[in-house]
């Protein structure tokens, strides 16, 4: 590699990091209320529906039985700030997470395609997009995981608070479980993130490629032979929306298991239902089996609706903001 290429590649990496961090921060803050509700559903052992046919009264009465009911409950008991519970560690997680993810993704695609131009990356095999997304997701997860753990704990604790802030939760985990405690649940998280990130980025590239093909066809037939394939912001939004929905729906059971591992041993108020004691689950397979046996198959999909309502626009916002911020900063910095 020539010395002249190194500054350009460094600028490209900085552009990807900054664009990824900004898009992740905006997406996370906008969708925080739905994320809090989703987490409350996922860590509730009791049924999350009032439909009798789906109920399995193994643990007792349910705290949350629907999106609207949960919204009213959180608003009444915790006020508006309750919907942004855990948002600070979430930002500390999402901003470096998306920064690392998009940077690694661009590096991998540049290596595979032999070009740093984003347009050339769309010519890659869809399988390479999936693999690149999975590797980028794993790298980003390892780099930001402690904040993911703190976010889940703070978002799920309710009132009265077990931990008043992120600092107190961090110190308590270090004291009681050591540094390794900050990585509780990392293994199931990596098992989840590999298919999730792969599907998210792979499907986004696939949808975007299809949209460009449609644009070429449309303009060549309707616009006097023009073959403009540029993708509009609304089309980018649709691609991100579809990618977020598809990837989250496919991997939701693994996300439920991940959340259960993350809050093992958390002493919440009894009104939030049966606690998840330490060592309740001996591994991912055991957790999946226990959830199905005690909560039914529906237990693996607790929080799916708020998760989809959140993930679809979150994915759309992330990709649209990233594309625009990346292009804008890239133009200012003279980076292709």
Swiss-Prot record:
Q: Name one GO biological process term.
A: thiamine pyrophosphate transmembrane transport
Where, subcellularly, is it found? Mitochondrion inner membrane
> Start-end of the Solcar repeats?
11-111, 124-210, 231-328
Top-level division of the source organism's lineage: Eukaryota
Q: Where are the transmembrane segments?
A: 11-27, 88-105, 127-150, 182-199, 230-246, 303-322
InterPro entries documented for this protein: Mit_carrier, Mitochondrial_sb/sol_carrier, Mt_carrier_dom_sf
**Keywords, sorted A to Z:** Membrane, Mitochondrion, Mitochondrion inner membrane, Repeat, Transmembrane, Transmembrane helix, Transport
- Free-text tissue specificity from the UniProt record: Ubiquitous with highest expression in pollen.
GO CC annotations? mitochondrial inner membrane; mitochondrion
Q: Name one GO molecular function term.
A: thiamine pyrophosphate transmembrane transporter activity
Q: Show the Gene3D superfamilies listed in the entry.
A: Mitochondrial carrier domain
Q: Name one Pfam family in it.
A: Mito_carr
For membrane topology, the record states: Multi-pass membrane protein
List cystine links: none
Function text = Mitochondrial transporter that mediates uptake of thiamine diphosphate (ThDP) into mitochondria.
Q: Which family does it belong to?
A: Belongs to the mitochondrial carrier (TC 2.A.29) family.
Name this polypeptide is given? Mitochondrial thiamine diphosphate carrier 1
Q: Which organism is it from?
A: Zea mays (Maize)
